[in-house]
């Protein structure tokens, strides 16, 4: 109890403006731009599913005390509008604002934006620009710091972009079909020349049908895809069944909608991207997997 009180006192004694993001990936971006001038926290904890998250009363209380709320937009946080309305008049920024999104092309979500734009390092730079502007309005005295932090982080994103491009370019052309549970890799695929196939387009784990599974099994078998993957925030049971039926391997767990805990393989967005592309290389490159 004493330690809990101590933590509460530390938070209340911290006079820095409070920034609350909807999920962990955005919190990581915000911390990189904010440096030590702002407090940054995420509503959704590492490992939690973001699409259908239901905010708790304590989440809403935290939001009402924040100075700024940061969301992704593009329909990712289905609960965000109710959440921000319940939080009162706290300013909210949408990091995808002004972006031309890729569109989902099938099922009930056809024509709607794919929300996973942070999976493209190039597009993530736009997120960083939004954060820099919002933080400079929130804390004008820190504007130079925010600009410097944003510039340094965008340089890391640019280097990451080249790193990922080189890694995926090394895959043989016939081995560039990425099979995941959710269609969360459209931006990565578009940037680096991958094809994608998946069990559901977005936010639709409950919509897996025998027909959809059979179609994916046929695709994996016909294209001789060596490995399939799934994301950390959903069950991989169906995808493992696809792998077994098609004669492929289950290639591992991607991180997309959530970072890992600090001691996991993807505690930051940069490490998340490297982890995922490492799995892609290992799973799809037959020469790599046979070493």
Task: Walk through the language-model features, giving the residues of each.
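Extracytoplasmic metal-acquisition and chelation regions
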Residues: 4-291
């Amino acid at each position: 109890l004493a330690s809990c009180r101590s933590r509460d006192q530390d938070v209340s004694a911290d006079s820095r403006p409070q920034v609350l993001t909807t999920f962990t990936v955005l919190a990581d971006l915000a911390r990189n731009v904010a440096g030590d001038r702002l407090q940054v926290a995420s509503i959704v904890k590492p490992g939690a599913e973001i699409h259908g998250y239901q905010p708790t009363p304590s989440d809403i209380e935290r939001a009402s005390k924040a100075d700024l709320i940061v969301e992704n937009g593009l329909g990712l946080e289905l609960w965000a509008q109710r959440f921000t309305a319940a939080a009162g008049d706290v300013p909210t920024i949408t990091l995808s604002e002004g972006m031309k999104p890729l569109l989902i092309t099938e099922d009930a979500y056809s024509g709607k934006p794919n929300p996973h734009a942070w999976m493209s390092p190039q597009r993530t730079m736009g997120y960083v620009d939004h954060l820099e502007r919002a933080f400079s309005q929130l804390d004008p005295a820190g504007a130079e710091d925010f600009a410097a932090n944003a510039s340094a982080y965008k340089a890391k994103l640019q280097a990451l972009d080249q790193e990922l491009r080189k890694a995926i370019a090394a895959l043989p052309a016939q081995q560039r079909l990425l099979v995941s549970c959710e269609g969360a890799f459209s931006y990565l695929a578009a940037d680096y020349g991958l094809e994608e196939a998946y069990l559901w387009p977005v936010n639709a784990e409950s919509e897996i049908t025998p027909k959809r599974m059979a179609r994916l099994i046929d695709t994996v078998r016909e294209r001789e895809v060596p490995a399939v993957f799934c994301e950390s925030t959903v069950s991989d049971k169906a995808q493992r069944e696809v792998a077994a039926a098609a004669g492929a391997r289950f290639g591992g767990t991607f991180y997309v909608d959530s970072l890992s805990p600090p001691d996991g393989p993807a505690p930051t967005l940069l490490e998340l991207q490297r982890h995922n592309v490492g799995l892609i290389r290992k799973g799809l490159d037959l020469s790599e997997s046979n070493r």
